[in-house]
Structures are given as C-alpha cells and as structure tokens.
C-alpha cells in the first residue's frame, strides 16, 4: 500500500533544481525526494542521503516514460513536484536581441526545452500523482531576459 508523501525535481542538477532538492530534503512532511537529471551522478552534497533517489534521464519522450515507470515501480505517491529544465541560451543557442538573430533551429531547441519537455513530463506523471492528496506541480521556464536586456527591448 502506498503511504508516503513524495516529491519530484526534474533538472535537479541545475541551480534552481539543486536549491529545490535542498529545500525538499529539509521538509519533514516529505518522506522521499526523487531527483531527475541529465547528469548521471548526484552532486557530492547529496551523497548518503537516504531520503533522496537520484535518477538519470535524457529528457526524450522514451526516457521520460522509462523514468516514470521506475517511479511507479517504487510506488511513488507524488504530492509535490518542480520541473526546472529549460534553457535561456547555451553553446548552440544565443539570445535573439534582433529579429535577424532568430533561427528555426534555435527556436525549436528553446521551445522543446521550455515547453514540450515539461508537458511530456506532466503527461507521464499523471500516473504517479497522489490518489489521496492534492499534487502541486510547478513548471519553471528559463526563457526570461535580464532587466538590463529588457530595458534595451528584451529578446524575441
């Protein structure tokens, strides 16, 4: 019988995700924290924490489904979650400060990371939402600009 109150952090190795994991580990109402990351190993600060299960995922639809199936096998009773993956820019995607900077490839990469992947998580996670409690999920997108960029007109 499922009796735990569990939480999930997707993109747990990023700055916001790591902070969410730290906060959830200190929450005594949560029994287990499942941290998902594209980084295979948990940061050293989380080693030997019996409350935490670190899970590797490449964020493809197939791997998201595999990860959720693992949560099901662990009888996850999800009451709280944070989906923190998203990109503002990376080596391949630069901020579009002019209309001419926009490319199909960069838009596809940004939309996939910030919109498609979170919805794929929700689609699969509905199977592990708590049956007895309300499950609260936050989706945090990285697609925001700095205040100084906004004063200059922002990004596209």
What do these predicted ranges mean?
Residues 68-69, 122:
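Short-chain dehydrogenase/reductase
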